[in-house]
From Swiss-Prot:
Keywords: ATP-binding, Kinase, Nucleotide biosynthesis, Nucleotide-binding, Transferase. It is an enzyme of class 2 (transferase). Phosphorylation of dTMP to form dTDP in both de novo and salvage pathways of dTTP synthesis. Its EC number is 2.7.4.9. ATP binds at residues 17-24. The gene is tmk. GO terms for cellular component: cytosol. Pfam families: Thymidylate_kin. This is Thymidylate kinase.
Length: 241
């Protein structure tokens, strides 16, 4: 299985979704499952170290951690275009310093949010031009896309109720309900456009059932990918198409 979204041997999995979808919980559950089911041991046996990069946007690098604080947890008024460019700066650093090196060595990247969130939040939510966002995403990533996008979808009211239980929300969570409805529509549009790489997961159910659905989706994908990975690594072809 050769990825059409990047030329590297590794596997790039992204979790997307609106507020309160449970992405953080599922990131940890997936990492535990990958370890317990032997997938990370298989990668170690192929001398892939580390076998898994568990990361997020914004905030996947030291620079990104500072940008995350500014974007999500400051009281500053940020212009929508400035916000878009700050997310792009975070992503450019993240791809260069974290995501691409991990994929080059043949490992798995599991990322909480990526380019789709920018389209959904800054495009559909804020109303910025989608072509401009696409161009900026292309610049920030160098065209590096995810192999599999797991979209944790649930009604906006349910997700926001979950976030309210955590206390005062971050800058994005504090937006009006109409904003979050537009964001959800953005994810829906992206899922329809990228149906070969997107998998909708019903997040309006208990966390263990969400985890089970994700595991079932990942299992077949991992088997196909790993067979190709072994051939590429054995042949010394980690980076090349």
């Amino acid at each position: 299985m050769h990825s059409a979204t990047h030329p590297y041997a590794g596997l790039f999995i992204v979790l997307e979704g609106g507020e309160g979808a449970g992405k953080t919980t599922q990131m940890g559950a997936i990492a535990t499952w990958l370890e317990n089911s032997g997938w990370l041991a298989k990668l170690r046996s192929c001398h892939v170290d580390p076998p898994l990069l568990l990361t997020r946007e914004p905030g996947g690098t030291p620079l990104g951690q500072g940008l995350r604080q500014l974007l999500l947890h400051s009281d500053l008024a940020i212009d929508p275009l400035a916000e878009l460019l700050l997310y792009a700066a975070d992503r450019a650093q993240h791809v260069a310093m974290g995501i691409r090196p991990q994929l080059q060595r043949g490992g798995i990247v599991l990322c909480d949010r990526y380019t789709a969130s920018t389209v959904a939040y800054q495009g559909y939510g804020r109303g910025l031009d989608l072509q401009i966002i696409q161009h900026i995403n292309q610049m920030a990533t160098g065209g590096l896309g995810a192999d599999l996008v797991l979209w944790l979808d649930l009604p906006v009211a349910v997700g926001l109720a979950r976030t309210q239980q955590r206390g005062r929300g971050d800058r994005l969570e504090q937006n009006a309900v109409a904003f979050h409805e537009r964001v959800r529509q953005g994810f829906l549009a992206l899922a329809q456009q990228g149906s070969d790489r997107w998998q909708r997961i019903d997040a309006d159910q208990p966390p263990d059932q969400v985890t089970q659905a994700i595991q079932e989706c990942l299992a077949a994908h991992l088997h196909r990918w790993f067979e190709t990975l072994k051939q590429r690594l054995t042949g010394g072809d980690r980076d090349l198409p």
